[in-house]
Regions:
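Short, polar N-cap/turn motifs at the start of nucleic acid-interacting alpha helices
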Residues: 25-32, 102, 121-140, 147, ...
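DNA/chromatin major-groove-contacting recognition/catalytic segments
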Residues: 49-52, 63, 119, 143-160
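Active-site/catalytic core of tyrosine-dependent DNA strand-transfer enzymes
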Residues: 54-100
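Catalytic-site neighborhood detector that most strongly recognizes the C-terminal catalytic loop/helix
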Residues: 37-41, 58, 80, 130-155
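Short helix-to-turn junction characteristic of helix-turn-helix DNA-binding domains
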Residues: 4, 8, 90, 116-117
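Basic, Lys/Arg- and aromatic-enriched nucleic-acid-binding interface segment
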Residues: 1-15, 19, 67-68
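Short basic/aromatic active-site micro-motif
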Residues: 80-82, 98-120
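Conserved tyrosine-mediated DNA breakage-rejoining catalytic core shared by Y-recombinases
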Residues: 11, 20-63
Length: 160
């Protein structure tokens, strides 16, 4: 579950993307993940994207690879198996497991995007990292950045 959580929080991967990720998709030299359709699996948008690795995820994946040199997949668990493990973790954390407030694996991706927006990352950059086909889907996160909008206009000065 830890690797699944790390890929969601630090790379914004969809659950299916994280579970389909193979070590050959991890470029340790240039520090990025390649999320690409394959003959046995496809991305939601059917497009390839590159997601850079920050220091924390890079170091984590490096340690994980060194401790699992023989595995092909980064996460060797089925979708259903991961779903059960994730929900068990959510329950142990005392988070909602039912109803409107239910915490799902998608919350990891949402957290990734939300934090980028709150840090002032342009929506088109967030869209590219998430693999959104356009920024319309990404605009769902724009309500999180009102202070950044205020800061942007506060810097405007005209005349004396």
């Amino acid at each position: 579950v830890e690797t699944f959580v790390m890929l969601g929080l630090f790379a914004g991967l969809r659950a299916g993307e994280a579970l389909a990720l193979r070590w050959q998709d991890v470029n340790f030299d240039q520090r990025f993940l390649t999320i690409a359709p394959r003959h046995d699996w496809t991305t939601k948008t059917r497009r390839t994207r590159v997601v850079p690795l920050n220091d924390e995820l890079f170091a984590y994946l490096k340690r994980r690879r060194e401790s699992n040199p023989e595995t092909e997949r980064v996460i060797e668990v089925s979708y259903e198996g991961m779903k059960k493990r994730f929900q068990r973790l959510v329950k142990l954390a005392g988070l909602p497991t039912a109803g409107e407030e239910k915490v799902t694996a998608h919350a990891l991706r949402h957290t990734f995007a939300s934090h980028l927006v709150m840090a002032g990352t342009p929506l088109y950059t967030v869209a590219a990292l998430l693999g959104h086909g356009n920024t319309e889907t990404t605009r769902l996160y724009s309500h999180l950045a009102p202070s950044h909008l205020q800061e942007a206009v506060n810097g405007l000065k005209y005349g004396g």
